A protein has these predicted regions:
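Flexible loop/turn segments at secondary-structure boundaries
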Residues: 1, 74-78, 118-121, 207-208
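Metal-dependent active-site segment of extracytoplasmic phospho-/sulfohydrolases and closely related
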Residues: 99-128
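Active-site neighborhoods of enzymes that stabilize oxyanions during catalysis
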Residues: 127-129, 134-232
Length: 243
């Protein structure tokens, strides 16, 4: 197996949070909080796409177009904060293994991206956190605030862009979080390059000259009679012949 990779980048939607980034990746016109709604939207654009969790990938998957979801890195970061960093190498190895599995199954190209990145804020004292700006603040999160008016504050970045019910977004100029509830250490939603620059990687199998066929029900062929078969080309390699 000889794999060639192209490392490109893209910009995440802002705020760099899951529901916003995923809605964009799945082609939604508006921000959709429910994952199944996002999946349904993609299927209206690409009817033959199959969307499954990465850990469910196996040789029985025969979708022509396949989207694999893997959210463990984000979930571990949210739960364990800094302690979750030690798990990332294992997750990277797992994803790499699954990419090789896809090529072994006959897929010619694999694209890897993410809904957002993250920033490591470290363990902070309360004095290190940024006060929430004064004004008509609709929602305040660790890495951004939403409002319906402009604020004259030189210490924050103001973005005039509608997001859900708000008209303005406010971001810290550093990796420090706004004062908010919850644990600190791992965060996303903000404006730093670590949060809003995402991978757009392409991997291709250079050894794939022709697609192989893996027949899983060979015993059923013993009951098939006749001289000629009509073969239709398929774009996947795992083929189950009818019984």
């Amino acid at each position: 197996l000889k794999v060639k990779g192209k490392k490109n980048i893209a910009f995440a939607e802002l705020p760099s949070v899951t529901e916003n980034g995923m809605s964009s990746l799945f082609g939604c016109a508006e921000v959709e909080d429910v994952a199944q709604t996002r999946y349904s939207n993609l299927k209206t654009v690409i009817p033959d796409v199959e969307i499954i969790q990465l850990e469910r990938l196996n040789s029985g998957v025969t979708a022509n177009k396949l989207v694999l979801m893997f959210g463990d890195i984000d979930q571990v970061g949210e739960k364990k904060q800094l302690a979750g960093l030690k798990d990332i190498n294992a997750y990277e190895a797992f994803v790499s293994e699954k990419i090789n599995d896809l090529f072994s199954m006959g897929y010619g190209k694999v694209y890897l991206t993410a809904d957002h990145g993250f920033v490591i804020t470290g363990i902070l004292d309360e004095a290190d956190k940024i006060p929430v700006p004064d004004g008509d603040i609709i929602k305040s999160e660790e890495r951004f605030c939403l409002a319906n008016d402009t604020l004259g504050n030189e210490n924050i970045i103001v973005r005039s862009q509608k997001y859900k019910e708000s008209q303005y977004q406010y971001y810290a100029k550093s990796d420090k979080p706004f004062v908010s509830k919850g644990a600190y250490g791992y965060a996303h939603g903000g404006f730093t390059p670590q949060e809003c620059i995402i991978p757009s990687y392409e991997f291709a199998n250079e050894n794939q000259e022709s697609l192989g066929v893996f027949i899983v029900n060979k015993s059923a062929l013993l009951n098939v009679t006749g001289t000629y078969f009509t073969v239709k080309p398929v774009s996947y390699t795992h083929l189950t012949l009818p019984t």
